[in-house]
Amino acid sequence: MSKICEICGKGPSFGNNVSHANNKTSRIWYPNLQKIKAVKNGTVRSIKVCTRCIRSGHVTKAL
């Protein structure tokens, strides 16, 4: 299961946790993906979409 938005292509970001002692450990930030039923290419499909795309209206939810 990929953690990528099917509309905008947003995926995981990589970086470091930094402690007060300046110790660094790598970590991953995942996008806030939601599984919704949406109309894509004229058919209703269940797709993974980030909340930014849902809020901005890039995807139309199926009723």
UniProtKB/Swiss-Prot annotation:
<dbReference type="InterPro" id="IPR037147">
    <property type="entry name" value="Ribosomal_bL28_sf"/>
</dbReference>
<keyword id="KW-0687">Ribonucleoprotein</keyword>
<dbReference type="GO" id="GO:1990904">
    <property type="term" value="C:ribonucleoprotein complex"/>
</dbReference>
<keyword id="KW-0689">Ribosomal protein</keyword>
<dbReference type="InterPro" id="IPR026569">
    <property type="entry name" value="Ribosomal_bL28"/>
</dbReference>
<dbReference type="GO" id="GO:0005840">
    <property type="term" value="C:ribosome"/>
</dbReference>
<protein>
    <recommendedName>
        <fullName>Large ribosomal subunit protein bL28</fullName>
    </recommendedName>
</protein>
<dbReference type="InterPro" id="IPR001383">
    <property type="entry name" value="Ribosomal_bL28_bact-type"/>
</dbReference>
<dbReference type="GO" id="GO:0003735">
    <property type="term" value="F:structural constituent of ribosome"/>
</dbReference>
<dbReference type="GO" id="GO:0006412">
    <property type="term" value="P:translation"/>
</dbReference>
<dbReference type="InterPro" id="IPR050096">
    <property type="entry name" value="Bacterial_rp_bL28"/>
</dbReference>
<dbReference type="Pfam" id="PF00830">
    <property type="entry name" value="Ribosomal_L28"/>
</dbReference>
<dbReference type="InterPro" id="IPR034704">
    <property type="entry name" value="Ribosomal_bL28/bL31-like_sf"/>
</dbReference>
<comment type="similarity">
    <text>Belongs to the bacterial ribosomal protein bL28 family.</text>
</comment>
